[in-house]
Amino acid sequence: MIDVNNFESMEIGLASPMKIRSWSYGEVTKPETINYRTLKPEKDGLFDERIFGPTKDFECACGRYKRARYNKRVCERCGVEVTSAKVRRERMGHIELAAPASHIWYFKGIPSRMGLVLDMSPRELEEVIYFASYVVLDAGDTGLEKKQLLSEPRYRELKEEYGNRFTAEMGAEAIQKLLADVDLAKEATELKAVLKEATGQKRTRAVRRLDILEAFLKSGNKPEWMVMDVIPVMPPDLRPMVQLEGGRFATSDLNDLYRRVINRNNRLKRLLELNAPGIIVQNEKRMLQEAVDALIDNGRRGRPVAGPGNRPLKSLSHLLKGKQGRFRQNLLGKRVDYSGRSVIDVGPSMKMNQMGLPVPMAMELFKPFIIHELTKRNLATNVKAAKRMIDKRDEKVFDVLEDVIKEHPVLLNRAPTLHRLGIQAFEPILVSGKAMRLHPLVCAAYNADFDGDQMAIHVPLSDEAQAEARLLMLAAHHILSPRDGEPIVAPSQDMVIGNYYMTTEDKAREGEGMIFKDTNEARMAYRNGYVALQTRVGVLTSSFDKKPFTAEQRQKIMVTSVGKLLFNNIMPEDYTYINEPTADNLQNGVPDKYFLEPGEDIHAYLENAPLVPPFKKGFLSDIIADVYKIYKVTVTSQLLDRIKDLGYYESTISGLTVGIADVTDLKEKPEIIEKAHKQVALVTKQFRRGLITDNERYERVIGIWNDAKDEVQNKLIEHMDIHNPINMMSDSGARGNISNFTQLAGMRGLMASPSGKIMELPILSNFREGLSVLEMFISSHGARKGMTDTALKTANSGYLTRRLVDVAQDVIVREKDCGTDRGLEVTAITNGNEMIEPLYDRILGRYTMKSVFNPETGEKIVGKNVLLNEEMAQKIIDAGVQKVTIRSAFTCNTEHGVCERCYGRNAATGDQVEAGEAIGTVAAQSIGEPGTQLTLRNFHTGGVAGNDDITQGLPRIQEIVESRNPKGKATISEVTGQVVSIEENPAEQTKDVTIKGETDTRTYTLPITARIRVAEGDDIHRGRAINEGSIDPKEMIRVRDVLSTETYLLSEVQNVYRMQGIDLLDKHVEIMIRQMMRKVRVMDPGDTDVLPGELLDISQFRDANYQTLISGGIPATARPVILGITKAALETNSFLSAASFQETTRVLTDAAIRGKNDPLVGLKENVIIGKIIPAGTGMGAYRNIKPKEVSVNTGATDGAITSIREMEEQLKDQD
């Protein structure tokens, strides 16, 4: 076997007949498979042991030689080589065809490759190949033309007239001869000459032909190889035949297809020997051609060959295609050993880096480790005895199991794996039962809940795999989401309500105004019932020796609540005391207003002091983010566990319950509804009198009922008791929101009909009163629509993610600094007056390209090439800076990736990104993962004329990344100048906008409903939209430059996500857009070898020009193109990646003719061939590291190494 990790690249080409014969171990001449009585393979048949190898390990067919000692011996009696039966998976055979057959991929594909080489149309080719017409091979002196088609009667006439002065033939044989006659170099030269004059259709055809001819010239493939004299036969174990119970056989479809080819081939041979009449031979040749076509790609031409039950047979092409094909099913998605799956259950008592593993699963997963340990400890004499012990569940085994799983991390995965946090590592803890236990805080990352979800578990085997799982994948490390750098692990549900209840303050609770010397004294008073958690008390500030209070504050008494004292007790010792849920408290410590001078009357203070709001879910997240920033991973994960334990404990003790009595009645509801009814009656009256249109009436009625619902909601909030458990639940962010409460206690309001239009009939009841039958029926429409939408959205979003990953999978951080001198000037993204993305979010975690100066004073805030952290970014914003030039993926010069500087900070760790990080995949997942939260529908903008439905949500994202013509397209100005006139033309229902540029004047005609964005006298830049709507990026890239198009697309994507409240970092979107813009189309090839109209990577284009300029030639010119992600993924330099994505046969056909070489740069192609991926520790720099013993010093840092870089630093120090 070849070692996959040792080769550089992989090449594909056309197989010559000699090559096919060299692969083969013998010719298959009989259609037989296996003998039905003996079940042994037939001689010379499709399963022959002489050709393909023995069916039993080291045993020949007749049984003369058995055992491995006869290895490689060929039996004299039966001719079978004695070797491992595995060879039946790799040995091929061949079939010598009695007449050549064309390969359907090259004849039928679009464009037809044979047609382009011969300059014949696919229709003409089909007539020749399938024996409908003759083609002239040699015209002699007859005045016919070469390649001219002749019908059967016409051929006979000419034959009588000219005899043997010309030759014409039919079938693939004729095409093979024509292909062999083509002088590639001569044709290519002629075409190049044609290209200089030709235009239009003729030019396009010439370019395509030249492209194919050049491909044959460069690759060394010969055109005649597109017609086959011999076809390979696949190894038998890859097209098996198995016996079912009842004596029937199940067989792979390929065997049927091969059998048809062999049968027809043998019949043709016999007919040729018998000198049968031409028409019979011709018919048999045509049938052989059709059999070969069906074998290669059944159904591509004519009706597919069907098997039993009229099911089309699966041919060789079908084995590769689609989700169930070889690429996606077996090469990209293998099933692995040492894995299992089970239902998950909650494990609230575990630490963040642990999971509960059921004993029976652990026994099976760690079996080899247990066996090894049992024999090592001499508890079992050999492997067999050890296995027996495990099967009998011997109690010694359990002790060994405990030791084996200690310190051995396992990986847990939940499908669908939408982002990289869908697989995390944990340390297993043995638990009883059959369900795996999952830590409650990692549920958010997995999107898991415990209503029957299942998860898969995998055991990393090698030491390196275990080390990576522990250092890089441990769940405790994954605190920030790679999408936006915010914490993804946050307390939820019970934990939130527990901490909320605990940090609530109440007036006049028992023991109010007591003053304690420290937290412990307060805890004792609480345990003994002198105070409640919600009691406001004083405590000596000086008792907190490590908390960062000011010297002044340390002399005073701080007013807080007992619950808050206990809450702060679980925080890191030197972390700020948290007394109110504000960012100010986190950044600058407890405000001075909470401190009393010793001797001041605390009761008087409490009389007037307002109650401080409790800590809600969002604030707990802020605390976690802040702690992470200061203390990094270890401390944060420990804190998270403490918050979790405290939350569960306190929510249990609080005794919060929900009953029907907690849903209060609203006294004002009847009069609000009465008022609304009157307004509706008034509007209807106006409509009947013809004062308003039906549309206006509808809009107003909807408006009236929405206002009524809002009023009910506001009244409910006013009357809401802060101790109401339902209110506490929604206010804390544990579950539900105010609209749920409105539906329980107020009114349900308006519902959507099945068409999505809002019905005028409101649901006046709430769930507390109960709905009438009609109301119930109406509201069921909306519920059903919600369910179907979600299902559709999931599929759409999943497919989007797949395309995004495919186009960006080869983008990896390749180097430290690409040395670019270009940057991206960023400002806040706004839409009208609405802030979409503030400048702070756009510059945080990025490198500056130029120094940033204070616009008022002119002083330098930060220099160039500086990574902006929170503090610096805030400084820039505070100084009133509007524009900052940053390093960006758009302007990065690194090939096949991005450099560390242009990428900036890794959102998932909060540190500078490291070389080897697979940022392309992370970017794709970050954009795709929230896809299910985006809406599927277009928003109907309340009937405002002209502003037709703006595409939003998922459809808009697809429109952008596939660079389709947008719905509601805006017209853009092609000149820079001034708007001189805007004229309406009512007769033709249009508006004409005239813009006077520096050189010419343009007039744009828009529909009369269009909302114009400019006014007369306005200055306008080229590429700016004249009316409301989305700009077509293809037009923009034509009129403006690449960078402004990229910037526009970035702001459009952000617009969609931020409108839905989803934060997404710019850098992810930048990477995707850069992948769409990486190609240029050659306009004029100059003196280079490239072809006009060819798509090239920018780097390839630059290299071609560089060589030409050095030798003093004229360089080529090209213009940038924008490709949709599907097209971009198919245009990648890796044919393996493209073929495994979509249109497998087309990609492979093209790659074979061009003799493409796959450099194995991306992740996908390396996974396909089983090579370690060139990202992370698989990068060249990290390979071939020799292990070295190091003394472990325990008193070092907090012990947790969080990145490879830290590991390297430590090793350096020890050297």
From Swiss-Prot:
One of its GO terms (cellular component) is DNA-directed RNA polymerase complex. Mg(2+) binds at D449, D451, D453. Zn(2+) 2 binds at C818, C892, C899, C902. It comes from the Bacteria. Keywords: DNA-directed RNA polymerase, Magnesium, Metal-binding, Nucleotidyltransferase, Transcription, Transferase, Zinc. GO terms for biological process: DNA-templated transcription. It catalyses: RNA(n) + a ribonucleoside 5'-triphosphate = RNA(n+1) + diphosphate. Binds 1 Mg(2+) ion per subunit. Binds 2 Zn(2+) ions per subunit. CDD domains: RNAP_beta'_C, RNAP_beta'_N. Zn(2+) 1 binds at C60, C62, C75, C78. Its EC number is 2.7.7.6. GO terms for molecular function: DNA binding; DNA-directed RNA polymerase activity; magnesium ion binding; zinc ion binding. Its cofactor is Mg(2+); Zn(2+). It is an enzyme of class 2 (transferase). DNA-dependent RNA polymerase catalyzes the transcription of DNA into RNA using the four ribonucleoside triphosphates as substrates. The RNAP catalytic core consists of 2 alpha, 1 beta, 1 beta' and 1 omega subunit. When a sigma factor is associated with the core the holoenzyme is formed, which can initiate transcription. Belongs to the RNA polymerase beta' chain family. This is DNA-directed RNA polymerase subunit beta'. The lineage of its organism: Bacteria, Bacillati, Bacillota, Bacilli, Lactobacillales. The gene is rpoC.
